Structure formats: structure tokens, C-alpha cells
Amino acid sequence: SLGLPGDLQKRNAAVAEAALQWMRSSHAVISDQAIRQGFASAHWPGRLQWMRWRGQRLRVDGAHNPPAAIELARERLSWPSAETRQIWILAIQAQKQAPEMLQQLLRAQDVAWIVPVPGHRSWNVEQLRQALPLQAQQLKSADTTGTALDQLLAQGWPEAAPVVAGSLYLIGHLLENGTLEAE
């Protein structure tokens, strides 16, 4: 059993297990029980993590580059709400490949709230609308993650839990200041 959610983590664990088996063949003393315990207790805050904001359920993921966005989009396929409109709250640093990330994440019915990464230069909604004219109508802007969440709550919390992603700094900030609570 693996303590980390998601197919990518299962693939990573398989690679780690193969490396551990190879190490054991070189006379390293690593028991099967130690390997099982290590995998079961693995925990990565901010990676496909269920959280709560004012009692409302949401998911956070630190996906901050195109390969991570591809994996997050792939992971979405296994969610019960996979075919439902997804609300994204995305904060992406200015030096990152935000248009490529949004092309991976957004489906036609989705909406993305673009928020700044606290304390960092970030992509804004106007830049992304220029870079992605076909998705421009799907992009909204908020000053903070909290403001975007307030808007969602005022409109009626979405059926599919919103996903906060795009920056490990944002996730760290939200966890550190207590905006989000772990489930």
C-alpha cells in the first residue's frame, strides 16, 4: 500500500522499489517490511491533497510545469467528477510555461481563476488571455486565492471540488497561514 495518491506516485514507487531490490542484491540490508512501511507512510503535502476551506472540500496540487500539468490532467481522468466542469484556481510564476500548463489542464467547460503567487512575479489573466485566445473566456482573475474561493462560495460551491494548483509557493503559503485545513 502506498501513502501517496495518484498514478504518477505509483509509477515512481515502482521505480523506487526496483532500485531498492537492486540495492538488496548488492548486499544492502533492507527488509521487505521496511520497504512496505516506507511506502505506506509516505506523505507529500500539496500533492493531490484533499483540504478544506471554510468547511468546503477542495483539492490542492503543486503542479508547476507542463509535465506536472500533464500528470494532473491525466489524474483527473480517474476522478468521479472527471466529466464535470472543473474549477481551477491557478497561480503560476512569471518564468513558468503557463500557457502550456493551461492547455493541458483546461477542457472546454472548465474555468480557471488566475491568482498571483504571493511574493513572486506571476502570470496575470490578461497575459494568459493574449497567449490563449481560444481559452480567453474561460479565464477569470482574482487578487488572492481567498478572493477566488469567496466568489465560488457566493455563486454556490461547485459540484466538482475546485483544484488549487500551479505553484508550490502558493500551496506552502496557504498551508502556512492556515487558509486551508487538512482533511
Place the predicted regions along the sequence by residue:
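Active-site catalytic pocket residues across diverse enzymes, especially alpha/beta-hydrolases
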Residues: M23-R24, R76, P80, L132, ...
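Active-site-proximal loop/hinge segments that shape catalytic or ion-binding/gating pockets
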Residues: S167
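Nucleotide phosphate-binding/pyrophosphate-handling subdomain across enzymes
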Residues: S1-V111
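C-terminal helical cap/extension that packs against the catalytic core
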Residues: R57-V60, P99-A161
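Residue-identity detector for threonine
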Residues: T84, T144-T147, T179
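Short, active-site-adjacent cap segments at secondary-structure transitions
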Residues: L170-G172
